Amino acid sequence: IQVYVSKVNDDRHGPQIFVSRTAPELLKRLFEREVPEIKDGTVLIENIAREAGDRAKVAVYSNDPNVDPVGTCVGPRGSRVQAIVNELDGENMDIVEYVKDPAQFIANALNPAEVLDVIFNEPEAPVTEEQPEENSTDDSVTETSDTSTEPESTEEEPVVTTEERSCTVVVPDSQLSLAIGKRGQNARLAARLTKYKIDIKPASEMEDNNDTLEEETDASED
């Protein structure tokens, strides 16, 4: 049986070894064992999202444009990935290609569902309390010499954290259940893989929203 050694502690009773079969690192090591191109660095694993014993998604990319990262990991007639599935007692495996374009990566991560569009949501600006202006009089103003200068204050732009990144994914109505997955698993794993909060909408709902928006715009112009 294959296990991942997650931690080793030394105490007075001797070393304690903690092992896991649910850690994503175990899946990574199994791919390194079964896929020579991963072990030699030609193909790299960008991220893994896993619900151990049920399903996992693995994002891979290639440093060689002539090497297909997904096909390489799947292997001839699926032999490589099947060996990993067998080791993990039938855990389903989705291997998707990682690309720098986040929209395409999200679409890949939702495989096997078809994606029509990915709309990124702007993060809400942080709410800051306005400071009350202090009443100043001429007596409170002090003069400074021309030779002294105050450093200019620069406000840093707020950093968008992973938790704030979100998008709406539009899929054909017939693909909605497939995109979401059983008990939401496909969407959940895709969100963890891409580090985006994903809201999946059917195309018909988005069209209705657009029609309503156009009607409201026409009414306001009249």
Segments from the language model and where they lie:
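RNA-contacting regions in translation and RNA-metabolism proteins
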Residues: 1-222
